[in-house]
Amino acid sequence: MSVTAANTNEQLVLDFFEVLSSGDLEALREFYHEHSVWEPKVKNIAGAGKHVGMDIIDKFLAPVRGMFEPGDPKVHVQNMFSAGPFVCVESFSTGKTMDGKIYENDYCWVFEVSNGKIDAMREYMDSHYTAKLFGMD
């Protein structure tokens, strides 16, 4: 299923996932500003909490991506809708961990965007699966 953007906010989010899936963390910087917030809605696992500004990349994404083979995980967008500055995405991610385990997880994302940047994003996933896969349970 191919998802196409209905507006510029949706296109920004699709572009974000394309770059995120590439593993090019430096290229992700163009999507954020100093007050951007990425909040995984999880508890008691690595990455929990709010990540702000370029710490999103330096202190959150870089360590998380380091748990996977280079270029993984990949995000596959299944559905997307938006209202005003909000974009909601249903997706799944696939990849391989550094120790060869297969990663497959379902996600829902809520983005708030303005002026061509991500102001805030909330990430929902099966955190129990993630904790178990990485031995955090």
Residue ranges, per PLM feature:
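Residue-level detector of alpha-helix boundaries and kinks
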Residues: 1, 13, 42-45, 96
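Short, low-complexity N-terminal intrinsically disordered segments enriched in polar/charged residues
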Residues: 1-34, 133-136
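A solvent-exposed, acidic/Ser-Thr-rich amphipathic alpha-helical stretch
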Residues: 30-80
